[in-house]
Amino acid sequence: MAESGSGAGSGSSSVGGVSNPTSLAPGDSQLIALIVEQLKSRGQFDGFRRDCLADVDTKPAYQNLRQKVDNFVSTHLDKQEWNADMNKNQLRNGLRQSVIQSGMLEAGVDRIISQVVDPKLNHIFRPQIEKAIQEYLAAQTKEEPAPPLPPGPPEPQEQEPPGPSQSVS
């Protein structure tokens, strides 16, 4: 019973409290988190990643970025005077910072995304995501008990017919 208070390790405690995801508005952060978790649990993100990685090294943007980074690293290391007392970690961290500050990674990755991910987005990824969302919401609708029917129009109450009028003649 000690586990009942620890929701941090489960990963779903922040979105698990939603009783009816179909009632959430499109774009709601809880709904998005639920859908992302569903895609992850189905392994679809891994599939997207594998699909992109299988294609990335054939694209000119990747080859160009790799060549730029190789040249940058070679130039940087050529400027260093090697000795046995050098701290390799400091050298590595300095090189990493120089590469990041150069801006070449950010620009290169943007080009890679436009060559690898963007073409797959509408034709491959979006249909799979939409299908997963529809299946998820359909399953959630089936799991939820049907909401009670709204009350119909009030039934007319039976009234006793008016008794014979007792008119005084």
UniProtKB/Swiss-Prot annotation:
Subcellular location: Cytoplasm, Cytoskeleton, Microtubule organizing center, Centrosome; Chromosome, Centromere, Kinetochore
Keywords: Cell cycle, Cell division, Centromere, Chromosome, Cytoplasm, Cytoskeleton, Kinetochore, Mitosis
Pfam families tied to this protein: COMPASS-Shg1
Gene Ontology CC annotations of this record: centrosome; cytoplasm; kinetochore
Biased composition (Pro residues): 146-169
Function of the protein: Required for proper chromosome biorientation through the detection or correction of syntelic attachments in mitotic spindles.
Official protein name in the record: Biorientation of chromosomes in cell division protein 1
